[in-house]
């Protein structure tokens, strides 16, 4: 399970040239004719993904290759691809399959595997020689140092000590590895690692290097947990700290909005959480929503967060991999996988007939070994339990929602973020009254209260009304359809204020055929929009139809015969002030691509909650 305060297991590609591999090759393919390097591609706590890359560094072709290495006790390969992998106890051997054994000079090939346990490979050999191609005849590699001991552990540092390695010619220095990556090279047998994150798990091991520059096997590993953190209880105290944005997987198509845009806009440094939307709910299970956008689409170097192009054979690509890269650069960001939504909520009623089985299916998908390190939580967006959305839920009892959330908490445990997007219908007998949100709040970290889309051009003749009113105003078409009413209703049902997030739409809703500037006018239908009639991104509206007035804490605009309502940086600031006064848990928004290229709405949320 991927926990909230686990360190990002892979901040970058971990190139670990390790000493050694057994070979079935001829003398022409000995020590210096090939190299093998290991990369840990993912880590989900109880296991990891790994990749070996074999390269022909000689001047003649290789006809076959064999890689060997040792794992410490308790670490093993559970599945592999593009190589035949066998073992004798803790010694592992990988041989080429038929199609990838021949390597021309300078060519390389990779194979991958999933593993369990905390250890790293050591004693690597490629075709009988050192994996780094630097075997020295008559000079033995150093032994493994002693397993490090940890002391003086603080929120941000730890002191490591180990017993010396031995070598026939002498030990020159030691590489200190944190989570498999070298973080320091020292000549002594102690090292203090600084700049760590509080309340976070790390794993350390050490390798010795001799005077011939040969690297020996890694020591055993020691687990270290820095002090601090939240103690593992759901929603310990988010206060006004949660600043969450929805990233839509379909945005990579027509909208041409990618994870890298969060970096170039400056938004990544100003948010705390991302909800990736959407996974589907089908046949009583959580399922992938768009496999191509989620984990298959290849990114070029200029499109990628880390500036590295995807390869055809890497285990994970597309949005999942880009989000992994984003977390490596911005480790404060937590990512949740969101399931359901307006279009895909129809599967929830069947799923909650067996909440435990549904929760297990969601856990198995979110914690799939290929991307378990990407996600820190799950978000359930059921529109709506025991009520109508795109379709009507006519089979679930009022307690179905809390039963689902209870099962999710039991399956995922206390250290995993569990949230839900919920209705903001605060009217008497409305959607909030239809489900047991108060009881369910015992099991969730927070609710994303969808305080937008109260009014829109689905009522094609009007009256025109702001789609995200903070409070009521004279002439509002429906009582209880405001942010204030929704929050008051949830609180009355026992939901703690700090488990409620206010929602901001990064878009406007509008009508055409409108002659009246103030709200309440008649219309002839929805105004034209870039992707859908009646809706338009803020980044477009701020220039095409600038705000001409405010009502109920939000803005509206009358331009020509069109009438739009949307939030601006100024109205967002007032809503953030209100959220803090109410003791809410923060804010979220739908969704990133509606903002300007410099992220001015995200900036307004960020500054408003400080």
UniProtKB/Swiss-Prot annotation:
Residue positions binding chitin: 313-314, 340-343, 384, 450-453, 590
Pfam families linked: CBM_2, fn3, Glyco_hydro_18
Source taxon at top rank: Bacteria
Active-site residue list: 383 (proton donor)
Residue pairs linked by disulfide bridges in the UniProt entry: none
Induction entry: By chitin.
Signal peptide: 1-30
GO biological process: chitin catabolic process; polysaccharide catabolic process
Annotated keywords: Carbohydrate metabolism, Chitin degradation, Chitin-binding, Glycosidase, Hydrolase, Polysaccharide degradation, Signal
Composition-biased stretches (Polar residues): 213-224
Domain GH18: 241-610
Catalysed conversion reaction: Random endo-hydrolysis of N-acetyl-beta-D-glucosaminide (1->4)-beta-linkages in chitin and chitodextrins
The enzyme's E.C. designation: 3.2.1.14
Sample GO molecular function, one term: polysaccharide binding
Domain (CBM2): residue spans on this chain: 31-134
Domain spans labelled Fibronectin type-III: 144-229
Positions of region (Disordered): 125-153, 208-239
Family: Belongs to the glycosyl hydrolase 18 family. Chitinase class II subfamily.
UniProt protein name: Chitinase 63
GN (gene name): chtA
């Amino acid at each position: 399970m991927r926990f909230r305060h686990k360190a990002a297991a892979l901040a970058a590609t971990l190139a670990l040239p390790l000493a050694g591999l057994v070979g079935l090759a001829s003398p022409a393919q000995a020590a210096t004719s090939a190299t093998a390097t290991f990369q840990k591609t993912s880590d989900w706590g109880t296991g990891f993904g790994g990749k070996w890359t074999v390269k022909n560094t000689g001047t003649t072709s290789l006809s076959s290759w064999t890689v060997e290495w040792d794992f410490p006790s308790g670490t093993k390969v559970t599945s592999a691809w593009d190589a035949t992998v066998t073992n004798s106890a803790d010694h592992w051997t990988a041989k080429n399959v038929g199609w990838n054994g021949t390597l021309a000079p300078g060519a390389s090939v990779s194979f991958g595997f999933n593993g369990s346990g905390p250890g790293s490979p050591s004693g690597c050999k490629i075709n009988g020689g050192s994996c780094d191609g630097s075997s020295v005849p008559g000079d033995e590699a150093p032994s493994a140092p002693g397993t490090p001991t940890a002391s003086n552990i603080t929120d941000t540092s730890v002191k490591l000590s180990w017993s010396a390695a031995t070598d026939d010619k002498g030990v020159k220095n030691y590489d200190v590895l944190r989570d498999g990556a070298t973080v320091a090279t020292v000549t002594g047998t102690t090292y203090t690692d600084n700049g760590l994150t509080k309340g976070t798990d790390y794993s350390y091991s050490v390798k010795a290097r001799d005077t011939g520059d040969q690297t020996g096997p890694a020591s055993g590993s020691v687990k270290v947990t820095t002090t601090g953190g939240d103690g593992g209880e759901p929603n310990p105290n988010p206060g006004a700290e949660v600043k969450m944005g929805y990233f839509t997987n379909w945005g990579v198509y027509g909208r041409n909005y990618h994870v890298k845009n969060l970096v170039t806009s400056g938004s990544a440094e100003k948010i705390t959480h991302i909800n990736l939307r959407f996974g589907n709910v089908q046949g009583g299970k959580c399922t992938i929503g768009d496999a191509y956008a989620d984990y298959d689409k290849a990114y070029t170097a200029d499109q990628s967060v880390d500036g590295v192009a995807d390869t055809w054979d890497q285990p994970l690509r597309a949005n999942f991999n880009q989000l992994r890269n984003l977390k490596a650069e911005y480790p404060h960001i937590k990512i949740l996988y969101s399931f359901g939504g307006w279009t895909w909520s129809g599967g929830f009623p069947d799923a909650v007939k067996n909440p435990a089985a549904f929760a297990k299916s969601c856990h198995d998908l979110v914690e799939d070994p290929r991307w378990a390190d990407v996600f820190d939580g799950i978000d359930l967006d059921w529109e709506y339990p025991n009520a109508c959305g795109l379709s009507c839920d006519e089979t679930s009892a009022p307690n179905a929602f809390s039963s689902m959330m209870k099962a999710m908490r039991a399956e995922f445990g206390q250290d995993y973020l569990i949230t839900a997007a919920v209705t903001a219908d605060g009217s008497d007998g409305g959607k909030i009254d239809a489900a047991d949100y108060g009881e369910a709040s015992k099991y969730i970290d927070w609710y994303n209260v969808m305080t937008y889309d109260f009014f829109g051009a689905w009522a094609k003749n009007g009256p025109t009304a702001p789609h995200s009113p903070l409070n009521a105003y004279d002439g509002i078409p429906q009582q209880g359809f405001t942010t204030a009413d929704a929050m008051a209703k949830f609180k009355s049902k026992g939901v703690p204020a700090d488990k409620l997030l206010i929602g901001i739409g990064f878009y406007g809703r509008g009508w055409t055929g409108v002659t009246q500037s103030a709200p309440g006018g008649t219309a002839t239908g929805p105004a034209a929009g870039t992707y859908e009639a009646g809706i338009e991104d803020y980044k477009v509206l701020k220039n095409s139809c600038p705000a001409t007035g405010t009502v109920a804490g939000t803005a509206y605009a009358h331009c020509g015969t069109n009438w739009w309502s949307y939030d601006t940086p100024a109205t967002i600031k007032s809503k953030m002030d209100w959220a803090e006064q109410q003791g809410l848990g923060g804010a979220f928004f739908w969704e990133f691509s509606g903002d300007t290229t410099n992220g001015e709405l995200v900036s307004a949320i960020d500054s408003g909650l400080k």
